[in-house]
Amino acid sequence: VKTTVIINPYAGNGRTEKLWPDIEAALKQSIGPFQTEQTKSQGDAVLLTRKALEDGATRIVAVGGDGHLNEVLNGFIENDVQLNPQASLSFVMSGTGCDFQRSLGISGKWQNAVAELKDAKVRKIDVGKVTYTAADKTQKIRYFDNIASFGLSGAVDHYIDNSRLGNYLGGTMLFLWATIKTVFSHPNQAIRYRIDDGPQEEILTRLSLLANGRFFGGAMYAAPEAELDDGLLDLLMLKEISLAKFLWHLPKIYKGTHLELPEIHFQKVRKFTAESSEQVIL
């Protein structure tokens, strides 16, 4: 096995850079020698992953947060084709949310992820694909391992990316605070959507998501019935809802008891298409 470790030192508001000497030592004990690459800016992980695969790496270990893991994943795939089908992707979560590993039953401590790598068996999982219109009006493609969402969640991510609260709050509290802060300025939005090959319908939604994994937003148990390898995505659309009712029901999403709420549209899908005359944040 030829291993390349790709680190985002900025993950977790710079926490990963401080932890790296300890993570590096633990990784060497767990998986043996490896090559190291560090990202400097957004998008670097995609390019570094592709170069590592071209140079013969058969295992890539992403060290950082969920966003970094997603970038590394996107380095594995180009035009819907895996660059090296024999290569595997592993991770050590040291970012803000650390949500994807929860779907695999790994607790939040990075030491546990490193320990899992020692005798890890390769598991095949599904990957979702998003085609979207970027802010510059160009068409983009992004692959995802965990959850793709739009609406309030996109606004929350934008808030966190531009906030220094991550220096003071842990992942769960940071996402909770950002959600409460953002929801006051984020309205229900009108979208037109189609599920699989069904008819086009319309809905007012504050938040919609397609889930491969079960958790997002710093431990929100958003999709308790999602499976990583069932060939399906769990669609959840939060219908038109008042601000007061949204805040009242918010604790349920941490427990995974929200699916039966009348304000939630839930079903298993293979394909979902949505469009809006409004700007909707992914």
Specify the residue positions occupied by each region the protein language model found.
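ATP/NTP phosphate-donor binding region
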Residues: 1-63, 70, 74, 111, ...
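Short amphipathic alpha-helical segments
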Residues: 17-19, 73-76, 102-104, 221-222
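Short, solvent-exposed amphipathic alpha-helical segments in soluble enzyme
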Residues: 20-22, 53, 77-78, 161-162, ...
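Catalytic core of DAGKc-family lipid kinases
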Residues: 30, 77-206
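Glycine-rich phosphate/pyrophosphate-binding beta-alpha loops
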Residues: 149, 153, 209-222
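ATP/nucleoside-binding phosphotransfer catalytic cores, i.e., glycine-rich phosphate-binding loops
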Residues: 195-197, 202, 221-222, 227-282
